[in-house]
A protein has these predicted regions:
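Short, surface-exposed connector motifs at secondary-structure boundaries
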Residues: 12-14, 91-96, 156-161, 232-236, ...
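Active-site mouth loops of central-metabolism enzymes
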Residues: 14-27, 72-74, 97-108, 162-171, ...
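Alpha/beta enzyme core
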Residues: 32, 103-239, 248-256
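Short gly/pro/ser/thr-enriched loop/turn and capping motifs at secondary-structure boundaries
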Residues: 48-53, 130-132, 194-197, 268-270
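Structural signal for hydrophobic packing residues in well-ordered secondary-structure cores
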Residues: 93, 116-119, 157, 281-289
Length: 301
C-alpha cells in the first residue's frame, strides 16, 4: 500500500486528512458516523479563556454552493474543554489539534499556557478574531499584529503552533511571511471569506450579524490559489482548506503545496466525508502507482 503518513513540524500524522475547526465540534457527535481512529487529526472548535456566548440568531444561511455562518465562536471556555473534550479525544488514536481564539494577546496566551501540560499535539491559532485593542480589525489582517501575536503565543506554547490565516487581505503572502517571522511552525489556510446575504422578502439581512464567513465548494478555487502562493513564499508546512468535499479536491490542495488538508463544510452535508476523502486519496495513489503521498506535495510549479 502507498504510504499516507505526513509530518507537520515533527508531528507524524497517519494520513493528511483532518477536520476543520468549527465543523466537527470535538468529534463527539461525528463519532457515531466516523471512526476517529482513521483521521490524521481532529481539529477542535475554537476555545477561549472564558465562555463565549456567540452571536444572536439567525447565525447560518445557505448560499449557492456553500454557506454563510456567523456563530461568533460560541464555546464553553478552556476549563470545560479540558475536563470534557480532551478526555474524550484521548480515547482515539488520532492527533489532537486545539483551535484557540481570543480578543487580545493576553486571552490567547492564557489558553496556550493552560494547554501546555495537556495531552494535545498541536495548537491552531485563529487570528480572524477581532483585535479589541486595534478597533476590531482582525489580528490576521495586519502583518505587524500577526507577527506580534505569533511571537507572544510562541513564548507560552509547548506544542507546535499553527497560525490560521484569513483570506480577507490584499496579499496573503505578506501575512504568511509575517507569521513565519513571528516563529510559526505551520500555517493553515484559508479561513472563511467575509460575505453577506439579504432576505429580500423581509428586507433585511439573512444573518443577525449582517456579515458571515463563507465556506463550501464555492470558495475552493480561491483557497487553492492562496495555498499555492503561500507555498511558494514561505518554507513552512501548510494545512490547506476551503471547500474540500472529495479526494480530488484534497489532492488539488496537496499538489498546490499543502502537506495536509482540513475538511469543513462537507461534514454538514456528508458526515462520512473525512474518511471517504482519506480512502479516495489512498485509491488515487495506488492507481497512479505513487508510493508516498509526500511525492505529490507541491508538484505543480
Amino acid at each position: 500500500m502507498s504510504r499516507m503518513n505526513v509530518n507537520l513540524a515533527g508531528v507524524e500524522l497517519k494520513n493528511p486528512v483532518m477536520t476543520a475547526s468549527g465543523t466537527f465540534g470535538s468529534g463527539t457527535d461525528y463519532s457515531e458516523f466516523v471512526d476517529l481512529n482513521r483521521l490524521g487529526a481532529v481539529v477542535t472548535k475554537g476555545v477561549a479563556n472564558v465562555p463565549w456566548p456567540g452571536n444572536p440568531t439567525p447565525r447560518v444561511t445557505e448560499t449557492a454552493s456553500g454557506m454563510l455562518n456567523a456563530i461568533g465562536l460560541q464555546n464553553p471556555g478552556i476549563d470545560v474543554f479540558c475536563e470534557r473534550d480532551i478526555p474524550f479525544l484521548k480515547k482515539y488514536d488520532t492527533k489532537i489539534i486545539v483551535n484557540v481564539c481570543g480578543k487580545s494577546a493576553k486571552d490567547y496566551c492564557e489558553v496556550v499556557e493552560r494547554l501546555g501540560n495537556e495531552p494535545v499535539d498541536m495548537l491552531e491559532i485563529n487570528v480572524s478574531c477581532p483585535n479589541v485593542k486595534e478597533g476590531g480589525i482582525a489580528f490576521g489582517q495586519n502583518p505587524k499584529a500577526l507577527e506580534e501575536i505569533t511571537k507572544e503565543v510562541k513564548k507560552y506554547a509547548k506544542q507546535p503552533v499553527i497560525m490560521k490565516l484569513s483570506p480577507n487581505v490584499t496579499d496573503i503572502t505578506e501575512m504568511a511571511k509575517a507569521a513565519e517571522a513571528g516563529g510559526a511552525d505551520v500555517l493553515s489556510l484559508i479561513n472563511t471569506l467575509t460575505g453577506m446575504k439579504i432576505d429580500i422578502n423581509r428586507r433585511t439581512f439573512a444573518l443577525a450579524n449582517k456579515t458571515g464567513g463563507m465556506s463550501g465548494p464555492a470558495v475552493k478555487p480561491v483557497a487553492v490559489r492562496m495555498v499555492y502562493q503561500v507555498a511558494n513564499a514561505v518554507s513552512l508546512p501548510i494545512i490547506g482548506m476551503g471547500g474540500i468535499a472529495t479526494a480530488e479536491d484534497a489532492l488539488e490542495f496537496i499538489m498546490a503545496g499543502a502537506t495536509a488538508v482540513s475538511v469543513g463544510t462537507a461534514n454538514f452535508f456528508n458526515p462520512y466525508a473525512t474518511v471517504e476523502i482519506a480512502d479516495g486519496i489512498q485509491a488515487f495513489l495506488e492507481k497512479q502507482k505513487v508510493e508516498d503521498i509526500n511525492e505529490l506535495i507541491g508538484v505543480v510549479k
